[in-house]
């Protein structure tokens, strides 16, 4: 019977066949140990010469790294094994031999591994990170479906930039100009006026010339929008959502976290509510900590975010940023017209901002005035202005960056490892 490695517990004591790749191999005299990988997990196969005969043992000893094969044997429970089960091998059938596999068990440099990203994905570490990424995506759908959100797919090709920035990828759309989307937010606002609570999940593109461990050129975002929600309502959704994601990974990816050496004691503290401080309070706190390179009105850099987050064990919301450094669609605070009703969620342990969100302006005249301040072409945004013309309501939304969230929860230092094929400033291959 053919099974997959993750089904091993159901077949203890039975002879089965597994299609797999040879991740690694070692031998000791008359015993060979095969580390097998099939995409669902890892398992050790034990080949004993006295039990399989000279020819089969010679075949097993000659196997090369990443050779594909069918392995037949009996599944045994083994508490000493890191995978919980192993196979007493009785037969090996080679499907396709692998010659001179470039990623050997020795240490390799980052550039070499990135050049061979299509093969690096096969490693134990990358397998663990991708499993955690998958769990965060799965849990996101579960959370928003349970909360009554409708999944909406905004376009990737757009005729305008949602935040009025210049960090856009330009392309021709027949005889017109088009851009790769930086965010689906404006379209999600339109959907919220139709369906109340909506969310999207898809790729976004930023032509930023940034070379930090937190930045990708192409990354994925979860973007919810909620009609009739004020800022505080949105913050409660955000903290419940992030706490839900962390618990899902703790519940369903414990083996992967262990494989990555993640200290889960930090993650076990991620229970809502999360602390909140204003931008002004954050600036004051930074000055108390000795930062003299930032004044009120400046945006935070990575060292500033890390210093603020270090004061808390959970993610922290920084609210009410200066109006001048935030996008046009954020409304002023009624009590202070120099700041807007917004918040960024800063993850602990130096991982920085993972969520940005705000209330949205729903008054037509206010929105038009803000667009003038930003020198935006109102004709290009006429459809968006229609939302304020025809029965708009107070509404809020946010965007969560998937790769930064995966990096934080998995304890991965650089976001390039949190997406299967990263697009970086100087990397478009493979």
Curated annotation (Swiss-Prot):
Q: What is its EC number?
A: 6.1.1.22
Which compartments is it annotated to reside in? Cytoplasm
PANTHER family named among the record's database cross-references: ASPARAGINE--TRNA LIGASE, MITOCHONDRIAL-RELATED, ASPARTYL/LYSYL-TRNA SYNTHETASE
What keywords sit in the KW lines? Aminoacyl-tRNA synthetase, ATP-binding, Cytoplasm, Ligase, Nucleotide-binding, Protein biosynthesis
| Family membership noted in the UniProt record | Belongs to the class-II aminoacyl-tRNA synthetase family.
Q: Which Pfam families match?
A: tRNA-synt_2, tRNA_anti-codon
Zinc is among the record's keywords: no
A biological process (GO) of this protein is: asparaginyl-tRNA aminoacylation
Q: What class of enzyme is it?
A: ligase
Q: Which reaction(s) does its UniProt entry say it catalyses? A: tRNA(Asn) + L-asparagine + ATP = L-asparaginyl-tRNA(Asn) + AMP + diphosphate + H(+)
Q: Which Gene3D superfamilies match?
A: Bira Bifunctional Protein, Domain 2, Nucleic acid-binding proteins
Task: Spell out the subunit comment.
Answer: Homodimer.
Q: Which GO terms describe its cellular component?
A: cytoplasm
Recall the GO molecular function terms of this protein's record.
Answer: asparagine-tRNA ligase activity; ATP binding; catalytic activity, acting on a protein; nucleic acid binding; transferase activity
Q: Under what name is this protein listed?
A: Asparagine--tRNA ligase
